[in-house]
């Protein structure tokens, strides 16, 4: 015959289960560690019906500039992310740097990137400026974060 346990025993069991993870104290560099690579993430809300236009224009501006920086070794990687299910925000831009030091601005690096962009795309400068100025009409910057991945230590 099955007997019914009092409600307080179920509540106690639930609290015990919920409390167990709280008793384990995690410690950085013992249980987990942040990676040295830093990711800059920009979150963008593109106006409805403009996503295709925005991505096409982004390819001609931001993606080109990031490709130059990657070719020159200033960034590890970059990416454009979208969501089919999100209404807003709906675009995420990421730039991966080797470490925090690689994110520091430098006049030499700035000049080198601009010279390479000019060499590759200088004849399109007016069109690219017009595209960049038009971004504000179709998108809103929602957030900007510097994040890093966590590695768990066995």
Predicted regions and their residues:
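An amphipathic, aromatic/His-enriched active-site/gating alpha helix that lines ligand/cofactor pockets
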Residues: 29-33, 68-76, 96-148, 152
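Solvent-exposed, acidic/flexible segments
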Residues: 47, 51, 55, 59, ...
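Bacterial N-terminal signal peptides
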Residues: 10-21
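Bacterial N-terminal signal peptides that target proteins for export
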Residues: 2-12
